[in-house]
């Protein structure tokens, strides 16, 4: 046998796998790659550098103390810093961070701002905030009592007002920051309106008071009038809005809800904290609060009998605010800027402050910062204002839950949320998603309303489409980590009690915009969701995108999904033609989205089409004839007419002033009293379209003598669905219908249920709505921007020219009080606005600055072809 000839292919050179590994091991032989070529065998760790982190983040109080304060909701204040672009929200936040953190990054000699809450690199480069970023700071009031202040720094640019909406939903109060020199601007106005719509109290910080001294060089008396004028304008806006939306306190420095600040120099005070400063320095034996009330308004100091009266003394004197507050402030500024060491020393000595000799060698700004922060101390006046005028997380819970929860008020869950009960069922309202460092997934940021959320806990994630009847939009996820989000670093916690803001890992997969988290095993009653965010603007600018390399389409689609999560108001959709479109609020918003899409979320080269705008379809007359349509089986016939809605009604429906969920009597009374409808029409409203807050109405205008109401009622849902489908995409160019009232004037419905199925009725209802619409002189509507332009007076004619060339028109040009600038207010069609800002800067040599925000819809001139 040994001499047997063995063929080459049968020769055995190596032992078999079974001989090597033994009979207990299964061996598989693959002769082909399981893994695609473009996928690496060992994945590299992706870490995209898009955020500014911080290694050393030690605070003056221990993190255990901060976490301990979270458990006492009556010591927690949740606020959002809101206001106009470049009014100093982020720098004001810097001042608070500097007072609570040991920060090597805060260099007293540096003249640059850290902008601590501008965590993204592009925010630092553009020098504006793009995302709302929260911080939880332990601040002390004037009695050295500690409070946990959860503060959200929001963007001031009108394009990013969706971030402000998300922040206000989580907050219990709004801190309105206003530039002392510029006063109330477009976004200040919108922030006031938005805060009042969210039923939040407002306190004001008048920031950049130093601009009145150093830039505008106003005398103290004029500075007082400028500040007073700003406060009056704010109050006018508050009273104008709150007359329709509930009661909000007016702003009054004497009441303590105004704080004056110069955040760049690190100082802030309220009249109350300034009064305490005087009491401490001079040992005056009366209450600080009483003195503070006399430091504002037409009050004068009489030195002969040391009293403060409304009547000025015979010798003449300035008002108390000018004499006691502004003059010392002016004195410090003028002497430090004048670099006269002796007089600075003498003035600071009056405030009980002595600086080391080395301090006087500093540049002007660092010296100002050092002197003023020592004179005014920490921001205890600001904390006092928050404590006194903004309710604690516990006290605010009832108003917050009433405004945001969609469920019934007599439930156990509702009561637990109102009581801020840590032992109650878990309810968390998530309104923001923040990307992880590799941008592959997101962490959800929300507010715990009741119960406690813990790491390792399984929760139900209820999306915006969830209801107890339709549970499709619900998933179960495990909470893997929890943090207190501190802008540039995160504080890990194992549990978050009610009233606190928390960043949650592990639940983001099914969340698109907002969500409600609740216990998995809570079965005692139905859980309802928190209302989705109600934005104060619309995404009307759209652009189409496609990948440069068509094979990378799946990557781009995944990136678009992440964009939709990251930007609260961005809408991404696929058109019938197959192109992917993104809708945003303006050019800067879309620019920011495209940067994120290319660099963070899809990492592919993307081609972008020229921006266009969304249109709406409407009618301007009643239908010229009754329009009918028969169902395909010829057994049903529906007749309709269309006519325009009354002026202002569409806005009322969209703003939630009237709701289809009201009972028929309340709904009827509203339309009867406000819009003069007759009782029959007012009581026969079937639906708003294309959704519950849609600007179109469907009415049943049939008479019981002519139509069988029982049969019509049987197909009501199908007709409503057909109407809403039609209203979502109109007959002219598939854009939503707006401002149209559809009336059913006749209907012949088959008595047998078999012949009146939804498959027959829905398309027919849509067809008849279309024909009624087309018979009523249809028109297109385009979105129109409200534009606010800041400019010197000599550029006015150039601005008028640029606007008129783009179909815009000026509604007002008014001088900005106390400054050499003018404010031009104008309307500009959005489709004409692309490149407007560049054009404006070119024609005014860069002196004019404009901001545009969606205002209303207007009919496009001309008849659509």
Place the predicted regions along the sequence by residue.
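Catalytic P-loop NTPase motifs of RecA-like helicase/translocase cores
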Residues: 88, 158, 184, 212-213, ...
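G-domain G4 guanine-recognition motif of GTPases
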Residues: 180, 203-225, 258-269, 332, ...
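P-loop NTPase switch module centered on the Walker A-proximal segment
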Residues: 40-177, 191, 216, 233
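Conserved C-terminal guanine-recognition region of P-loop GTPase G domains, centered on the G4
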Residues: 142-143, 168, 173-252
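C-terminal-of-GTPase-core extension/linker across diverse P-loop GTPases
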Residues: 237-441, 572
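Intrinsically disordered, low-complexity N-terminal segments enriched in charged residues and glycine
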Residues: 1-75, 128-129, 134, 271-277, ...
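Structured, non-catalytic alpha/beta "coupling" segments that mediate domain-domain communication
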Residues: 90-91, 374-388, 392, 498-520
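Accessory interaction regions appended to the cores of large information-processing enzymes
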Residues: 224, 235, 245-248, 266, ...
């Amino acid at each position: 046998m040994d001499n047997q000839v063995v063929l080459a292919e049968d020769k055995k050179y190596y032992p078999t796998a079974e001989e090597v590994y033994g009979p207990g091991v299964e061996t598989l032989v693959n002769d082909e790659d399981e893994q695609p070529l473009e996928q690496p065998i060992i994945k590299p760790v992706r870490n995209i550098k898009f955020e500014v982190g911080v290694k050393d983040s030690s605070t003056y109080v221990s993190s255990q103390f901060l976490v301990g304060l979270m458990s006492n909701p009556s010591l927690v204040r949740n606020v959002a810093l809101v206001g106009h672009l470049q009014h100093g929200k982020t720098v004001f936040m810097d001042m608070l961070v500097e007072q609570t953190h040991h920060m090597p990054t805060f260099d007293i000699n540096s003249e640059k701002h850290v902008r601590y809450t501008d965590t993204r690199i592009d925010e630092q480069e553009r020098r504006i905030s793009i995302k709302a970023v929260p911080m939880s700071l332990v601040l002390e009031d004037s009695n050295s009592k500690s409070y946990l202040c959860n503060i959200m720094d929001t963007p001031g640019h009108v394009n990013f007002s969706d971030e402000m909406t998300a922040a206000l939903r989580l907050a219990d109060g709004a801190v309105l920051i206003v530039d002392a020199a510029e006063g109330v601007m477009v976004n200040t106005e919108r922030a006031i309106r938005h805060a009042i719509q969210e039923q939040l109290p407002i306190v004001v910080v008048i920031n950049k008071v130093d601009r009145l001294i150093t830039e505008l060089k106003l005398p103290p008396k004029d500075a007082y009038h400028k500040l007073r004028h700003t406060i009056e304008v704010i109050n006018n806006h508050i009273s104008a809005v709150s007359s329709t939306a509930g009661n909000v306190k007016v702003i009054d420095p004497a009441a303590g809800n105004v704080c004056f600040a110069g955040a760049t120099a690190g100082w802030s005070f309220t009249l109350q904290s300034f009064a305490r400063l005087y009491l401490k320095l001079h040992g005056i034996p009366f209450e600080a609060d009483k003195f503070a009330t006399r430091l504002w308004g037409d009050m004068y100091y009489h030195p002969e009998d040391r009293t403060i009266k409304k009547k000025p003394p015979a010798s003449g004197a300035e008002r108390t605010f000018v004499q006691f507050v502004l003059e010392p402030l002016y004195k410090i500024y003028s002497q430090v800027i004048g670099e006269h060491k002796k007089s600075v020393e003498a003035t600071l000595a009056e405030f009980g402050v002595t600086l080391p000799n080395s301090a006087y060698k500093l540049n002007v700004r660092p010296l100002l910062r050092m002197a003023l922060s020592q004179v005014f101390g920490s921001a205890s006046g600001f904390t006092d204002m928050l404590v006194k005028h903004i309710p604690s997380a516990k006290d605010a819970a009832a108003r917050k839950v009433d405004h945001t929860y969609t469920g019934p008020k007599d439930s156990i869950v509702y009561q637990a949320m109102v009581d801020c009960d840590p032992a109650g069922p878990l309810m968390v309202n998530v309104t923001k998603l923040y990307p992880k460092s590799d941008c592959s997934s997101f962490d959800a940021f929300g507010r715990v309303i009741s119960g406690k959320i813990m790491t390792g806990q399984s929760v139900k994630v209820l999306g915006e489409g969830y209801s107890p009847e339709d549970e499709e939009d619900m998933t179960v996820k495990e909470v893997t980590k929890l943090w207190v989000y501190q802008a540039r670093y995160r504080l890990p916690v194992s549990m978050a009690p009610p009233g606190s803001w928390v960043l949650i890992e592990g639940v983001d997969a099914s969340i698109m915009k907002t969500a409600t988290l609740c216990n998995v095993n809570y079965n005692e009653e139905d859980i309802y969701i928190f209302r989705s965010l109600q934005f104060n603007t619309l995404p009307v600018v759209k652009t189409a995108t496609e990948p440069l390399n068509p094979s990378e389409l799946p990557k781009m689609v995944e990136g678009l999904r992440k964009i939709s999560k990251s930007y609260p108001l961005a809408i991404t959709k696929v058109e019938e033609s197959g192109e992917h479109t993104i809708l945003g609020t303006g050019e800067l918003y879309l620019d920011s989205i495209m940067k994120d899409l290319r660099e963070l979320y899809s990492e592919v080269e993307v081609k972008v089409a020229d921006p266009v705008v969304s249109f709406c379809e409407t009618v301007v007359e009643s239908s010229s004839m009754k329009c009918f349509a028969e169902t395909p089986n010829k057994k049903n016939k529906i007749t309709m007419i269309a006519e325009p809605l009354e002026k202002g009604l569409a806005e009322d429906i969209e703003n939630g002033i009237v709701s289809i969920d009201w009972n028929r009597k309340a709904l009827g009374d509203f339309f009867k009293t406000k819009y003069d409808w007759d009782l029959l029409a007012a009581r026969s409203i079937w639906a708003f379209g294309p959704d519950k807050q849609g600007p179109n109405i469907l009415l049943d205008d049939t008479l019981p003598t002519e139509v069988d109401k029982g049969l019509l009622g049987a197909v009501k849902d199908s007709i409503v669905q057909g109407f809403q489908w039609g209203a979502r995409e109109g007959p002219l160019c598939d854009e939503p219908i707006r401002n149209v009232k559809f009336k059913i004037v006749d209907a012949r419905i088959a008595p047998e249920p078999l012949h009146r199925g939804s498959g027959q009725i829905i398309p027919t209802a849509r067809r008849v709505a279309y024909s009624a619409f087309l018979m009523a002189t249809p028109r297109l509507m385009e979105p129109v921007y409200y534009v606010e332009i800041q400019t010197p007076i000599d550029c006015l004619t150039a601005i008028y020219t640029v606007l008129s060339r783009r179909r815009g028109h000026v509604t007002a040009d008014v001088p900005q009080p106390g400054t050499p600038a003018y404010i031009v207010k104008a309307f500009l069609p959005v489709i004409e606005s692309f490149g407007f800002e560049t054009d404006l800067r070119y024609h005014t040599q860069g002196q004019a600055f404009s901001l545009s925000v969606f205002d209303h819809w207007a009919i496009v001139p001309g008849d659509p072809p």
